[in-house]
Curated annotation (Swiss-Prot):
Leading EC class: transferase
Name used for this protein in its record: Bifunctional protein PyrR
Keyword Nucleotidyltransferase in annotation: no
Keyword Transcription attributed: yes
Pfam families tied to this protein: Pribosyltran
Gene Ontology MF annotations: uracil phosphoribosyltransferase activity
Keywords: Glycosyltransferase, Transcription, Transcription regulation, Transferase
Taxonomic placement: Bacteria, Pseudomonadati, Pseudomonadota, Gammaproteobacteria, Pasteurellales
Amino acid sequence: MEKIIIDHDRFLRTISRISHEIIEKHQTLDDLVIVGIKRRGAEIAELLQRRVEELSSINLPSMELDITFYRDDLTLVDQEDKMPVYSGSSQYLNIQDKTVILVDDVLFTGRTIRAAMDALTDFGRAAKIELVIFVDRGHRELPIRADYVGKNVPTSRDELVQVRTEKQDGCYEVAILGK
């Protein structure tokens, strides 16, 4: 069973709202960089970057972050001798003394974010890391909390939350899949 909880229009309104929140929280955007976790987090980061630029005329430096080898669940990912493929980060971005806006699609256990923070250290020591999550579904296993949340969606552990993006899925929407 599938239930659409965010449609295309609401998806883009959520991007706009989060962009406004980022701008409002910072007196200046000069030391901000935006980093999206591949794949859907990176596409959401790109949407946020474009919207922030539309609103402020400032183009935030950005990159896509591949956390493949920083994950602590590689043995779970490695099914039937299929090793995960590291595609690399889109570019090198020096984050030394910058405020990093880290973006991902769904916050669940917190393990992906922990892996992303580990991966970020390869790019310098950030002054601060702020977290943007499009959907927070709860069930944390690590003490991770988002600074900006598109939507809080209480779920059961059996349900799956899918954030669908144009490049990956051909549309912008969020669905819950369950029994």
